[in-house]
Amino acid sequence: MLLNGDCSENLKKEEGTSEPPRENGLDEGEPGDETTGQEVIVIQDTGFSVKILAPGIEPFSLQVSPQEMVQEIHQVLMDREDTCHRTCFSLHLDGNMLDHFSELRSVEGLQEGSVLRVVEEPYTVREARIHVRHVRDLLKSLDPSDAFNGVDCNSLSFLSVFTDGDLGDSGKRKKGLEMDPIDCTPPEYILPGSRERPLCPLQPQNRDWKPLQCLKVLTMSGWNPPPGNRKMHGDLMYLFVITAEDRQVSITASTRGFYLNQSTAYHFNPKPASPRFLSHSLVELLNQISPTFKKNFAVLQKKRVQRHPFERIATPFQVYSWTAPQAEHAMDCVRAEDAYTSRLGYEEHIPGQTRDWNEELQTTRELPRKNLPERLLRERAIFKVHSDFTAAATRGAMAVIDGNVMAINPSEETKMQMFIWNNIFFSLGFDVRDHYKDFGGDVAAYVAPTNDLNGVRTYNAVDVEGLYTLGTVVVDYRGYRVTAQSIIPGILERDQEQSVIYGSIDFGKTVVSHPRYLELLERTSRPLKILRHRVLNDRDEEVELCSSVECKGIIGNDGRHYILDLLRTFPPDLNFLPVPGEELPEECSRAGFPRTHRHKLCCLRQELVDAFVEHRYLLFMKLAALQLMQQKASKVETTTSLENGGLPSSAETKSEDSIGPEAGCEEEGSSVSGLAKVKELAETIASDDGTVDPRSREVIRNACKAVGSISSTAFDIRFNPDIFSPGVRFPESCQDEVRDQKQLLKDAAAFLLSCQIPGLVKDCTEYAVLPMDGATLAEVMRQRGINMRYLGKVLDLVLRSPARDQLDHIYKIGIGELITRSAKHIFKTYLQGVELSGLSAAISHFLNCFLSSYPNPVAHLPADELLSKKRNKRRKNRPPGAADNTAWAVMTPQELWKNICHEAKNYFDFTLECDSVDQAVETYGLQKITLLREISLKTGIQILLKEYSFDSRHKPAFTEEDVLNIFPVVKHVNPKASDAFHFFQSGQAKVQQGFLKEGCELINEALNLFNNVYGAMHVEICACLRLLARLHYIMGDYAEALSNQQKAVLMSERVMGIEHPNTIQEYMHLALYCFASSQLSTALSLLYRARYLMLLVFGEDHPEMALLDNNIGLVLHGVMEYDLSLRFLENALAVTTKYHGPKALKVALSHHLVARVYESKAEFRSALQHEKEGYTIYKTQLGEDHEKTKESSEYLKCLTQQAVALQRTMNEIYRNGSSANIPPLKFTAPSMTSVLEQLNVINGILFIPLSQKDLENLKAEVARRHQLQEANRNRDKAEEQPMAPEPEPEPERAVEDMGSPQTAKEGPSSLNLQG
């Protein structure tokens, strides 16, 4: 049992500062979240077991939990091997039928040992359809085609290929230490230095995918639906089946079950055929008529249940694969039916026809949230309806672009058309009625939906009761952007002018306000840092707003208050919005800003606003502390300086104007004394009785004024989002406020350039963050509030950095990202001019121009373009993609690359030094396969899995047949499990303080809550499992570590992608736990897989590759593959030296690992040479007396003795020839324990078997050293890396030296203590 919120409270108490007044900032709980009360949670109700009696099988026991629903037992039975063929049944307890949707704890008389009877129910058409669909799913359960096709939330996983199935108990039966040498040899393309980057190993063939054919055909019969007279006999529908033995049969699905009828393909005869066998289950009927079906279906189900559940559970959002093998297209009745209906008749358990998405989305928000069980129920409902809405919206958007949905305004031009499908409203990203004329036209219309989505995301997170947003999904597909929104009840019957009662429909000319909206939005203004302000409307009346003018308030027919058009929720980014007569701070003009962007909707990110406010808060504390100290020191001086309105001169007088955005940037948190001042200030301001003395009040007033706070009694920074909006006017009386707000915006723009971008580069230099591909680089930038349009500036700073070599990987990733983003911008407009019939030809031509060395690829026009001269004239109502345009076919590689360079300069302000792909590869060290992956992921292209000869100058790399599909790229809201997240963070904090057991309990609790809200599959659950696995490993429970990490790998593959950098990390962790569990060949397979993926995603030269190669080298050393081991360890040494410098402790460790292998090979001279290098580094860095230096010195002596002994023996042989009588030399094969110790060291895991008291002393000592270091070196890394707000913990870094004082600051989890 835990007290909710207790941990975070304790953490704050431990820090022990009572802070001065602060009205906003980052340390608030989730607004609108009433979790602060001490409330007791009891999540784990004890489970109990019930007995299940099903027809035709032995009774069996089932473990259930009281908060499960009866429906969940249904699901379990539909999944079990022996009952999976039943779908239409009810459960009875003592003769009473149980309600599907009731919780087990509410069922009277249900207890330990109760007997539940499975009773077959009569079918309806809907139940018969569900049954056929379920049988089809069982037949296809091992077939990966749905995952390759991106259907029904299926996605790929390949872990089982490398682990030979499950790692649990079966792992113990595998070869342990008897190693088959073949297992150790990596494929040639994985070895260090290999230039080959094959694509096929990305998706290895899984032997379970060789389909066992149970039936040749199972499809709906052409005789459907049954005629009236047959309906009255109970016929529901007819099926047509061809068995594996080539027998054709027609089957009737009736209310009582399934039986054969006498119909043929051309003759309808519904009478029962022989054998006259009526079965409630279609599977039982097919078992009767086909021996092959009976045999193969049983084998199939056995294999299905042996697979790990995580390989088959649906993911919450669809994940698409950018490559797929050539698949045969098989007949599939369910797929065919899905394609031509919208599944409206039988959406899962939804009564009526289509779902009312808006009502569902808003009702779930209205659920109660006073205590934890209520909040869990609410968050689960919100998450479920969001993932369903996203799936439906994606499907609808594709149908709209493919031309399969009728427009609601069909007579208008295609760009202006709007659509409604399945109760969702769809609009295209074009500037329809010159709405965005002043903001950038179509370009602004393309950007506005994502800005709006960010606004929806933010308001949803603040979660104010009574304020509603629309369900919003933005879909990019075939070059078009489609916005899908839920529909406000009644909005289609009224004019927009009548509906809008708050905000403006014409960007600020006419503006209205409403007291209820002001009241609701006021509650969001603090967490969102939005200033309540007044503007003038077209009649020069003052109107009060608490949002940007574009934000509209509409009361729906359901009485709810909706806000929409949230595209300016955050303040404008002045670096990309030149305003005549406005000067930007020097930091901006030095960097070449302001720059004219192609639209005027550039906003600062929420993360930037939060970081800026946090930075200003620290500055506020420092200024106030400084004044207070000087008040104490000299009252006279202080009085004078305060009267002059300045600050005391001891730390360079800074007046209000000179508080630049970068003030305090470098010094932030740079000394222990700074924090002490802040604490002292807090204590001084808040005296015992809670009053504030007048002098302190004066101090606060001055500090508030200096940092731009809107209040003079407390720190409170907010932004006016309408500042610099074209067309928005402010009253005369607000001029001072407007001037201050303009200055604040300028400071924020400069803060981004002077603090955030250098901070990012610094973090990259110190390897606090390790992006591996474009997506992870973008994520790292966005976490710091840096928009992608600043990518060119980031790269400029990297180029000018003194640590340029240490940032080689960042530069390479950044250039690749810049090129592929520029190519994506061009591809978008390129695709809009392509007819559906020319899509694969156009995409393959684009890829050839982009990536192939073939100098002049020729586009293959669709055949009808060449033949048909008489094109029909009916072209008005064509789908958006149906332009009569073959302009795409004339593009050349030279032209495309010229455009890419132009786009890079224009958009990112970066000059690319290349005019072809080969030049780009050569100049920047890029890989074509990596560029192919990046462009495919960004645009939704799926290509054939095969080896492409990019470098051939005789034929183009891609043909039409190589482009298999184009998928949508979907942006949507990600609802959060807030309570689970708080537990996860508290658990992380406990672990970092060394309290492993308490941390483990909190993380376990978080896992339960995450599962409760998200179901079994989610990115955040993946992070949770990884941390749990590591904790269990440190605490010595290898089996549990293995089980959790296996789940983490499977989940990462399924929800993030099989080659996502996170998946690569997970593979490495799993390999370590496998090695510790003596599964050596599996450990190597996993490490080889990780290395292959890293080579594909980035290439050879990444700091993380050093860690990976050290792992591989150590394992190979352990299995006595010394030559192979050296190849990897020496590569790791080279990479470590490059990125950390030749004198780093990590390099010393690397030398030591290489020396050990040479010792095992009895090549003592090389071993000595490497160990000497290591010894020199230890001696220089740590001094003679450090334990590491001594260890190295001892090892050197030992090596010298062995070398002398060997030399003596050799001399003996030379002297006496073969008759010499010499004792055999002892070569030491490394023990598994010593290898594991070294593996733990390089992976940043430290075991300290100490008593509790020793542990406490050690913690105190570590803390003391840490503080000393901060004070002495002014290089406190720990403070500059606060715990990330994301649930994803940073990848743990390897620790170079366990005994060194550097250890404690090496990375987030580098120091793990075990009691």
From Swiss-Prot:
Residues 1-35, 638-672, 1268-1315 are annotated as: Disordered. Residues 335-577 form the Clu domain. Disulfide bonds: none annotated. The keyword Plastid does not apply. The lineage of its organism: Eukaryota, Metazoa, Chordata, Craniata, Vertebrata. Belongs to the CLU family. It is found in: Cytoplasm; Cytoplasmic granule. The keyword ATP-binding does not apply. This is Clustered mitochondria protein homolog. One of its GO terms (biological process) is intracellular distribution of mitochondria. Pfam families: CLU, CLU_N, eIF3_p135, TPR_12. Gene3D superfamilies: Hypothetical protein (hspc210), Tetratricopeptide repeat domain.
